[in-house]
Protein backbone atom coordinates (compact mmCIF):
# COMPACT_ATOMS: atom_id res chain seq x y z
CA UNK A 1 0.00 0.00 0.00
CA UNK A 2 1.29 3.46 -0.87
CA UNK A 3 2.36 5.75 1.95
CA UNK A 4 0.34 8.89 2.46
CA UNK A 5 2.31 12.08 2.05
CA UNK A 6 1.17 13.74 5.29
CA UNK A 7 2.47 17.19 6.04
CA UNK A 8 3.16 18.30 9.60
CA UNK A 9 1.07 21.07 11.12
CA UNK A 10 2.62 24.41 10.16
CA UNK A 11 1.87 27.30 12.52
CA UNK A 12 1.82 30.52 10.51
CA UNK A 13 0.76 33.14 13.07
CA UNK A 14 0.35 33.05 16.83
CA UNK A 15 -1.25 35.47 19.28
CA UNK A 16 1.21 35.21 22.19
CA UNK A 17 -0.23 38.07 24.24
CA UNK A 18 -3.67 36.44 24.30
CA UNK A 19 -2.86 34.07 27.18
CA UNK A 20 -1.52 37.00 29.20
CA UNK A 21 -4.37 39.44 28.48
CA UNK A 22 -7.27 36.97 28.65
CA UNK A 23 -8.44 34.10 30.85
CA UNK A 24 -9.14 31.39 28.28
CA UNK A 25 -12.21 29.25 28.99
CA UNK A 26 -12.59 27.12 25.85
CA UNK A 27 -10.97 26.65 22.44
CA UNK A 28 -12.42 25.55 19.13
CA UNK A 29 -10.83 24.88 15.73
CA UNK A 30 -12.44 26.80 12.87
CA UNK A 31 -11.83 26.79 9.16
CA UNK A 32 -11.27 30.14 7.48
CA UNK A 33 -12.54 31.17 4.04
CA UNK A 34 -9.63 32.67 2.10
CA UNK A 35 -9.09 33.66 -1.52
CA UNK A 36 -6.21 32.24 -3.55
CA UNK A 37 -3.89 35.19 -3.07
CA UNK A 38 -4.63 35.19 0.66
CA UNK A 39 -3.62 31.53 0.96
CA UNK A 40 -0.35 32.22 -0.85
CA UNK A 41 0.34 35.23 1.35
CA UNK A 42 -0.43 33.24 4.53
CA UNK A 43 1.98 30.52 3.42
CA UNK A 44 4.70 33.20 3.19
CA UNK A 45 4.25 33.71 6.95
CA UNK A 46 3.79 37.48 7.18
CA UNK A 47 0.32 37.29 8.73
CA UNK A 48 -0.53 38.96 12.05
CA UNK A 49 -3.52 38.08 14.23
CA UNK A 50 -2.43 39.90 17.41
CA UNK A 51 -4.97 42.75 17.12
CA UNK A 52 -7.78 40.64 15.68
CA UNK A 53 -10.99 39.27 17.18
CA UNK A 54 -14.07 37.36 16.03
CA UNK A 55 -17.58 38.79 15.89
CA UNK A 56 -21.07 37.69 14.89
CA UNK A 57 -22.70 39.16 11.79
CA UNK A 58 -25.89 37.76 10.34
CA UNK A 59 -25.73 34.45 12.21
CA UNK A 60 -22.14 33.77 11.12
CA UNK A 61 -18.81 34.35 12.81
CA UNK A 62 -16.29 36.62 11.10
CA UNK A 63 -12.61 37.29 11.82
CA UNK A 64 -12.14 41.05 12.09
CA UNK A 65 -8.90 43.05 11.78
CA UNK A 66 -6.56 40.17 10.90
CA UNK A 67 -3.77 41.45 8.68
CA UNK A 68 -2.92 39.22 5.72
CA UNK A 69 -0.61 41.35 3.56
CA UNK A 70 -0.99 41.52 -0.21
CA UNK A 71 0.70 38.81 -2.24
CA UNK A 72 3.48 40.50 -4.22
CA UNK A 73 3.17 38.42 -7.41
CA UNK A 74 -0.61 38.97 -7.76
CA UNK A 75 -0.86 42.42 -9.27
CA UNK A 76 -4.46 43.49 -9.90
CA UNK A 77 -6.05 40.32 -8.51
CA UNK A 78 -4.86 41.05 -4.98
CA UNK A 79 -7.04 41.13 -1.88
CA UNK A 80 -7.68 43.78 0.76
CA UNK A 81 -5.28 43.10 3.68
CA UNK A 82 -7.66 43.74 6.61
CA UNK A 83 -10.99 42.62 5.18
CA UNK A 84 -13.37 40.57 7.41
CA UNK A 85 -12.98 36.82 6.80
CA UNK A 86 -15.68 34.24 7.35
CA UNK A 87 -14.96 31.47 9.86
CA UNK A 88 -16.31 28.03 9.02
CA UNK A 89 -18.02 26.42 12.02
CA UNK A 90 -20.95 24.09 12.61
CA UNK A 91 -24.25 25.71 13.58
CA UNK A 92 -24.12 24.19 17.10
CA UNK A 93 -20.65 25.62 17.66
CA UNK A 94 -21.77 29.06 16.47
CA UNK A 95 -24.80 29.01 18.78
CA UNK A 96 -22.68 27.92 21.76
CA UNK A 97 -20.02 30.58 21.18
CA UNK A 98 -22.46 33.42 20.52
CA UNK A 99 -24.54 32.46 23.57
CA UNK A 100 -21.47 32.72 25.79
CA UNK A 101 -20.48 36.04 24.24
CA UNK A 102 -23.94 37.58 24.69
CA UNK A 103 -24.80 36.19 28.14
CA UNK A 104 -21.47 36.03 29.93
CA UNK A 105 -19.66 38.99 28.36
CA UNK A 106 -16.88 36.88 26.88
CA UNK A 107 -14.76 37.58 23.80
CA UNK A 108 -13.71 35.45 20.83
CA UNK A 109 -10.00 35.81 20.14
CA UNK A 110 -7.75 33.91 17.72
CA UNK A 111 -4.82 32.05 19.27
CA UNK A 112 -3.17 30.42 16.25
CA UNK A 113 -3.44 30.39 12.47
CA UNK A 114 -2.02 27.21 10.95
CA UNK A 115 -2.23 24.70 8.13
CA UNK A 116 -3.39 21.22 9.18
CA UNK A 117 -2.17 17.87 7.80
CA UNK A 118 -4.40 18.21 4.74
CA UNK A 119 -3.04 21.66 3.93
CA UNK A 120 -6.21 23.53 4.98
CA UNK A 121 -5.95 26.87 6.79
CA UNK A 122 -7.36 26.59 10.32
CA UNK A 123 -7.77 29.07 13.14
CA UNK A 124 -7.67 28.13 16.82
CA UNK A 125 -10.35 30.34 18.32
CA UNK A 126 -10.62 30.92 22.08
CA UNK A 127 -13.62 31.87 24.17
CA UNK A 128 -12.04 34.17 26.74
CA UNK A 129 -12.69 36.78 29.38
CA UNK A 130 -10.47 39.86 29.68
CA UNK A 131 -8.14 40.03 32.69
CA UNK A 132 -7.90 43.01 34.99
CA UNK A 133 -4.50 44.52 35.80
CA UNK A 134 -4.30 42.79 39.18
CA UNK A 135 -5.06 39.42 37.54
CA UNK A 136 -2.20 39.97 35.09
CA UNK A 137 0.15 40.76 37.97
CA UNK A 138 -0.95 37.63 39.80
CA UNK A 139 -0.33 35.49 36.72
CA UNK A 140 3.13 37.00 36.36
CA UNK A 141 3.94 36.31 40.04
CA UNK A 142 2.85 32.67 39.69
CA UNK A 143 4.97 32.24 36.57
CA UNK A 144 8.02 33.82 38.22
CA UNK A 145 7.58 31.63 41.31
CA UNK A 146 7.36 28.45 39.23
CA UNK A 147 10.59 29.44 37.42
CA UNK A 148 12.32 30.17 40.73
CA UNK A 149 11.06 26.89 42.20
CA UNK A 150 12.52 25.00 39.23
CA UNK A 151 15.87 26.74 39.69
CA UNK A 152 15.92 25.90 43.40
CA UNK A 153 15.07 22.25 42.77
CA UNK A 154 17.87 21.95 40.20
CA UNK A 155 20.37 23.66 42.49
CA UNK A 156 19.56 21.44 45.49
CA UNK A 157 18.90 18.22 43.56
Swiss-Prot record:
**Its GO CC terms?**
cytosol
Any Pfam family matching the protein: SmpB
Listed GO molecular functions?
RNA binding
Q: Name the UniProt key words of this record, in alphabetical order.
A: Cytoplasm, RNA-binding
Cross-referenced PROSITE patterns: SSRP (PS01317)
Q: Which residues form a coiled coil?
A: none
- Return the annotated region ranges for Disordered: 134-157
Recorded hits in Gene3D superfamilies, A to Z, give: 2.40.280.10
State where composition is biased (Basic and acidic residues): 134-151
- Major place of residence: cytoplasm
Q: Where in the cell is it found?
A: Cytoplasm
Q: Which SUPFAM superfamilies match?
A: Small protein B (SmpB)
One GO biological process term is: trans-translation
Kindly indicate whether the keyword Cytoplasm belongs to this entry: yes
**What task does this protein carry out?**
Required for rescue of stalled ribosomes mediated by trans-translation. Binds to transfer-messenger RNA (tmRNA), required for stable association of tmRNA with ribosomes. tmRNA and SmpB together mimic tRNA shape, replacing the anticodon stem-loop with SmpB. tmRNA is encoded by the ssrA gene; the 2 termini fold to resemble tRNA(Ala) and it encodes a 'tag peptide', a short internal open reading frame. During trans-translation Ala-aminoacylated tmRNA acts like a tRNA, entering the A-site of stalled ribosomes, displacing the stalled mRNA.
Q: Which NCBIfam families match?
A: PRK05422.1 (NF003843), smpB (TIGR00086)
The family classification in the record reads: Belongs to the SmpB family.
Q: What is this protein called?
A: SsrA-binding protein
Q: Which organism is it from?
A: Rhodopseudomonas palustris (strain BisA53)
Phylogenetic placement of the source organism: Bacteria, Pseudomonadati, Pseudomonadota, Alphaproteobacteria, Hyphomicrobiales
Amino acid sequence: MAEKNERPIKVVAENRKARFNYAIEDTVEAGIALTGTEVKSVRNGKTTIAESYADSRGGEIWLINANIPEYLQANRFNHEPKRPRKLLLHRKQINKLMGAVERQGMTLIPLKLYFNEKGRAKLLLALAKGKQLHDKRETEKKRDWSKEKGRLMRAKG
